[in-house]
Amino acid sequence: MKLSDIIFHLKMKYFTPKTLLNDREIAWFIENENMIESIDEKFPLDYESQLQPNSFDLRIGTSCIRLDAPSSGIIDVRKPIKTMPVYSLLDPGFVTIDPGEFILLNTIEKFNIPNGMIGFVQGRSSIARMGLQTEQAGLVDAGFQGTITLELYNESPYPIRLYPGTRVAQIHFTTTNKSNRVYGKNMNSKYNGQIVATGSRIHHDIK
């Protein structure tokens, strides 16, 4: 190992700068802190296509949810929000999003966000130019473990078909001071540990 590589490793391990991570730093956290892993052996992490200069591309998995019409005709945040059963994209092998339709999809990537790190998710430009918006709540807190549920909305006048492994979003990472309360511990962490696409659990917030 080169001296420069040793210095870089020590810097990342003990003196990580509080800044937006670049490709080399993201790769370091993946390889040394298991910050990102794949939940599907058919789709291992692919640095060549996914690792960008300051971000990491996210691919849709095989788990999908569509909202179901509430019996009252109103979505009430005090009550569990009704969704259709989670279904797999493995059969027929794709998902078609109709114009004006909103769906939830999981990512193939599972995250283990260390304390002192946060992620920001946003859509890819190539996807947005088709009229498909990624409406995800973009902050991924320190301590979060699990896949990300992406919220996709088709604003185009045409149906859009996606396949497992399609890169639809990207995540940026920035380092911060360590938190006293991380996601998953000592707080209402409703989505920690999620692997499949997960609907809203906002009713847990209402006391």
What residue ranges belong to the model's regions?
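Non-catalytic terminal segments and appended small domains
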Residues: M1-K207
